Amino acid sequence: EVLAVFEQPFYEMNSDVVSQSLCLALDEIQDPGNLGTIIRVADWFGIEHIFCSQGTVDVYNPKTIQATMGALARVKLHYCDLPSFIASLKDIPVYGTFLDGDNMYEKKLTPHGLIVMGNEGNGVSAEVANLVNERLYIPNYPPQRETSESLNLAMATGIICAEFRRRMANV
C-alpha cells in the first residue's frame, strides 16, 4: 500500500482567466470517475481551470484522483457558488451543453470562454442555464438514426473540448 500526504492547494478565484483562455464549469457533477476523467480531458486539451459548483463531488475522492492519472497536478479546480461566478463574467461567452441546443459544428466558437457541463442525470441546472448565452448540442450520426438518448458526461466533455481546440488550430 502507498500513502501520500500533501497540502491541498487553494487557487484564488479570478474571472480574468475566463476572458483569456478556455475554461470548464461543472454543475453538480456526482460521479467521481467522471470528474477525474474530465480533469484528464482538460489537461489533454490545455484547459487549466475548472470551476465547480459546491455540489460537485470532492476532487480528492480516491476514485477521482485515480481517474485523473496525474492530471490533477496541472489543472486547477475552483469550488464556488457557480451561478454567482458565471453572473460575474461580463462580455465573455458562456457555452452550455443541452439536448435542445444548437448543433455545435454549425456554431461560431471562440478560443476563450466558459463551457458549462451539467449533472449526469439532470443536465445543467435551471439557475445556471439562465446564465448560458450559447446553447450547444452534440449531434448524433447519422442525424435521423435512432440512438442512445445521451452521451456519458466525460465523453461529451471530450468531444466538446476537441471541437473547440480543432477550431483554434484552424484560426
Language-model features: locations:
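Structured adenosyl-cofactor binding patch, chiefly the S-adenosyl-L-methionine
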Residues: 44-45, 59-73, 126-171
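Glycine-rich phosphate-binding loops that contact phosphosugars or nucleotide phosphates
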Residues: 4
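Short, glycine- and charge-enriched coil/turn segments that flank and shape catalytic ligand pockets
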Residues: 13-21, 91, 106-108, 142-144, ...
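Active-site/ligand-binding-proximal alpha/beta "capping" segment
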Residues: 95-148
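RNA substrate-binding interface of SAM-dependent RNA methyltransferases
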Residues: 10-101
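Conserved catalytic motifs of the protein kinase core domain
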Residues: 1, 21, 112
